[in-house]
Regions:
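Thiol-based oxidoreductase modules, predominantly thioredoxin-like and allied folds used
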Residues: 90-111
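Short active-site neighborhood of thiol/selenol oxidoreductases, capturing the structured segment around
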Residues: 59-69
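Non-catalytic, surface beta->alpha helical segment in thiol-disulfide oxidoreductase systems
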Residues: 131-164
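N-terminal secretory signal peptides
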Residues: 1-19, 26-32
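Boundary at the C-terminal end of the N-terminal hydrophobic targeting segment
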Residues: 35-37
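Typically the conserved alpha-helix immediately C-terminal to a functionally engaged Cys/Sec
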Residues: 75-88
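Structural micro-motif
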Residues: 115-130
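A short beta-strand-turn-helix
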Residues: 44-61
C-alpha cells in the first residue's frame, strides 16, 4: 500500500501525520462545505395562525416539527422526509425549536417563545411532528421520535393521509 506524503517530515518508510491545516484543505477540496451548505432547512415558525391559514387554503394540514439543535434524528427527519415533502408537495411545514427564546405568535395570537409553546404542547421528545387542522386541532396522533429510518416514511405518510381525510 502506498502512503501519501503531505510534505511533512516523517520517519523513513512511514507517512507523515497530516497537519490539521492540510486536512482542512483536503476536506475543502472534496467539496464538503457545499454539501453542508445544502442542508435542507424548514421555515422557522413565527405565527402559527398564519401558517395554519396558508395550509388550510391549500386544503392541507399544518405540519409542525419540534426540533432540537444537534439532534441527529431531527436532521434525518427534516432532510429525508419533511423538506422533500414541502418542496415536492407544497406542504406547509414549519419548525419550532426546543430551548429557543425566539418569539412565536401562537394560534390565538399570543406571543411566547418557541420553548414556551413546546411546553404548552407537553412535547418532551425531539423530533416530534404535529398535524394541525381547523381551529388548531391536532388531527392525528403525534409522530414522536426518530423510529427506524426504514419505517419512518411509512409512519409519516400514514399520518399525513389520515390528517388529510380528517380535513376533507
Amino acid at each position: 500500500m502506498t502512503a501519501i506524503d503531505l510534505g511533512e517530515s516523517a520517519r523513513p518508510g512511514r507517512a507523515a501525520p497530516p497537519s490539521r491545516r492540510r486536512m482542512m484543505c483536503a476536506l475543502l477540496g472534496l467539496g464538503l462545505p457545499a454539501a453542508w451548505a445544502a442542508d435542507p432547512q424548514l421555515p422557522v415558525a413565527t405565527a402559527l395562525a398564519d401558517h395554519l391559514k396558508v395550509a388550510l387554503q391549500r386544503k392541507e394540514p399544518l405540519l409542525v416539527m419540534v426540533s432540537l439543535a444537534g439532534c441527529p434524528f431531527c436532521k434525518a427527519v427534516r432532510e429525508s422526509h419533511l423538506a422533500p415533502m414541502q418542496r415536492e408537495q407544497g406542504l406547509q411545514v414549519v419548525q419550532v425549536d426546543m430551548m429557543s427564546g425566539q418569539p412565536l405568535r401562537d394560534f390565538r395570537g399570543a406571543v411566547q417563545t418557541h420553548t414556551q409553546q413546546i411546553e404548552s404542547w407537553a412535547v418532551r421528545i425531539a423530533p416530534t411532528v404535529l398535524f394541525f387542522g381547523r381551529d388548531a386541532v391536532e388531527l392525528v396522533p403525534r409522530l414522536t421520535g426518530g423510529y427506524l429510518p426504514d419505517f419512518y416514511g411509512a409512519y409519516l405518510d400514514q399520518r399525513l393521509e389520515t390528517a388529510r381525510k380528517a380535513l376533507a
